[in-house]
Swiss-Prot record:
It comes from Pyrococcus abyssi (strain GE5 / Orsay). PANTHER family: 60S RIBOSOMAL PROTEIN L3-RELATED (PTHR11363), LARGE RIBOSOMAL SUBUNIT PROTEIN UL3 (PTHR11363:SF5). GO terms for cellular component: cytosolic large ribosomal subunit. Disulfide bonds: none annotated. Coiled coil: none annotated. GO terms for biological process: translation. Residues 350-361 have a biased composition (Polar residues). NCBIfam families: L3_arch, PRK04231.1. GO terms for molecular function: rRNA binding; structural constituent of ribosome. Part of the 50S ribosomal subunit. Forms a cluster with proteins L14 and L24e. InterPro entries: L3_arc_euk (IPR045077), Ribosomal_L3_dom_3_arc_sf (IPR044892), Ribosomal_uL3 (IPR000597), Ribosomal_uL3_arc (IPR019928), Ribosomal_uL3_CS (IPR019926), Transl_B-barrel_sf (IPR009000). It comes from the Archaea. This is Large ribosomal subunit protein uL3.
Length: 361
């Protein structure tokens, strides 16, 4: 229903509308789960396509074939490279210590420019974290890990999280990894620690962490659009045909008193490249090696001619219902839904009858 008084279409809750600090999105809140698993994953946005599927959610179209636009996010395996432990401080959680795995050689990355020379994980990680210890041996690692175990037994540590890095060289995107932190589900610090300890230095694939059919929250930095006027940025009305001094402006920027311009007045400025979270996106399916298995048949998810501005999907991928924020090739993070609806869809892959692989050019 329309409103008589409508100064803007955009929400002031997101003010100030400025550029995000980092292109790697942050996650400040985590769902509480008893299952021991990493609470989320990360990948790179490849593009969109559409599918036909049998609707398995309660409603008028239940059991019928429906059209569904989907986003493909390529998810090369994450590498767990450390543990971060927190103690309870006066103002909240404080970092108590970190344990980083010692350096090792990567089997899945060989530099063509360096005549086949293999890179170590540290060499690539240092492109993102300049403060990594230089002379860090296996003995140092085991000593730090033992100290952390003692702190957990004494009850000093209240939370442990996994430090992970993406591996974009696996999908031939770039060399510099993205580094981030993920919470772990579980009821005690000990079982969370044991889970991360087992995964340290190893790869973690999306199928080990997420389940087909579950609801996810998608966190990303939106497409940047630069400086835009108040009509596009805030959705204000165009002024009348014969209005003076411009049509795409606000009619008044405020009263005489208070003798200043309020921050709530819709003005021109930065639009896009904002940090945003979209809730309750369904994970339709998970594929491996760029292929989706449907009724025993393997289907290449890459459309004819490749995804525009992206190319070929080579690794594991997520198929998420609807659109997600962010530009092509941008890092996208997901976590299990923190505020799921009361009527949740079943946690299983819906029956997919058709996947569009026609050209998107």
């Amino acid at each position: 229903m329309g409103k008589v008084h409508r100064p803007r279409r955009g929400s002031l809750a997101f003010s100030p509308r400025k550029r995000a600090k980092s292109i790697v999105p942050r996650i400040r809140s985590w769902p509480k789960e008893t299952e021991v698993r990493m609470l989320g994953f990360a990948g790179y946005k490849a593009g969109m396509t559409h599918i036909l599927m049998i609707d398995d959610e309660p409603g008028l179209t239940n059991g019928k074939e429906i059209f569904m636009p989907v986003t493909i996010i390529e998810t090369p395996p994450l590498r767990v490279f450390g543990i971060r432990a927190y103690r309870q401080g006066y103002l909240g959680l404080e970092t108590a210590t970190e344990v980083i795995v010692p350096d090792f050689e990567l089997d899945n990355y060989v530099s063509k420019k360096a005549k086949g020379r293999k890179f170590t994980f540290y060499q690539l990680l240092k492109r993102r974290i300049a403060t990594l210890p230089k002379n860090y041996t296996k003995d140092d690692f085991e000593q730090k890990l033992g100290n952390l175990e003692d702190m957990i037994k004494e009850g000093e540590i209240v939370e442990v999280r996994a430090l992970v890095a993406t591996q974009p060289w696996v999908i031939k995107l770039k060399k510099k990894p993205e580094v981030m932190e993920y919470a772990i589900g579980g009821t005690s610090v000990e079982e969370k620690f044991n889970y991360i300890k087992e995964k340290l230095g190893k790869e973690l694939r999306v199928g080990e962490v997420l389940k087909e059919g579950e609801l996810l929250d998608v966190i990303a930095v939106t497409k940047g659009k630069g400086t835009q006027g108040p009509v596009k940025r805030w959705g204000i009305k165009l002024r009348a045909h014969k209005d003076s001094k411009g049509r795409r402006k606000v009619g008044s920027i405020g009263p005489w008193h208070p003798a200043r311009v309020m921050w709530t007045v819709p003005m021109a400025g930065q639009m896009g490249f904002h940090h945003r979270t979209e809730l309750n996106k369904r994970l339709i399916a998970i594929g491996e090696n760029g292929k989706l298995v449907i009724d025993g048949n393997e289907i290449e998810i890459t459309p004819k001619g490749g995804f525009p501005h992206y190319g070929i999907v080579r690794s594991d991928f997520m198929m998420i219902a609807g659109s997600v924020p962010g530009a092509i090739k941008r890092i996208i993070r997901v976590r299990p839904a923190i505020r799921p609806p009361k009527k949740k869809p079943p946690v299983q892959r819906p029956q997919i009858t058709y996947v569009s692989v026609e050209s998107k050019q």
